[in-house]
Amino acid sequence: MELLVERTFAIFIAISGPILTIFDLPGNTLLLLTSLMFAFFDEVLYFNGRLLSAMVLIYALGEFWEFCVGLFGIKRRKVSWFAVIFIALGSFTVTLLGTLIFPILGSLLGGMAGAFAAAFAYELAHAGVSAAAMQLAWTAAKMRFFAMVGKLAAGIALAALLLKQVVFFKYII
């Protein structure tokens, strides 16, 4: 009975983690912490050094990918750090609004639309040229999309490894 509860909990977290990641919530962190919790809860059954190392590496790469693509992808367009932060805040704010209006897909589209709108508004106010503003806005939307896809891929990999660790493990007995 205990194994059934543990497996059910792991399956629930493995499904919830990537969904939370889509909403810009800490789904990948939840997946990693759940895996570590299982490993230290019953180390005979669930502790696997290679698997946990792979999960930590995938988690770090997913966070690094989102940070670098989201921020430095826009920064290479030679905008100020204020613009980068303004675009990130616009993206996050409209992600939340998009999630409220149209769950799941709305968060992804909201993040891209928020980055687009914030970049367009910044560049239009800064330079006053709508063509340059449109170009920066499209770049911001694309960078936000690529950042989210990379982090979601890491979340799906973490979910698969959590299922491998808890549901599809080999009995050592």
Where are these regions (language model features)?
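Interfacial segments of multi-pass membrane proteins
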Residues: 30-47, 94-98, 102, 113-122
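Interfacial loop-to-transmembrane junctions
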Residues: 129-153
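Transmembrane alpha-helix interface/packing and boundary motifs in multi-pass membrane proteins
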Residues: 13-31, 93-104
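Juxtamembrane boundary at the C-terminal end of a transmembrane helix
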Residues: 160-173
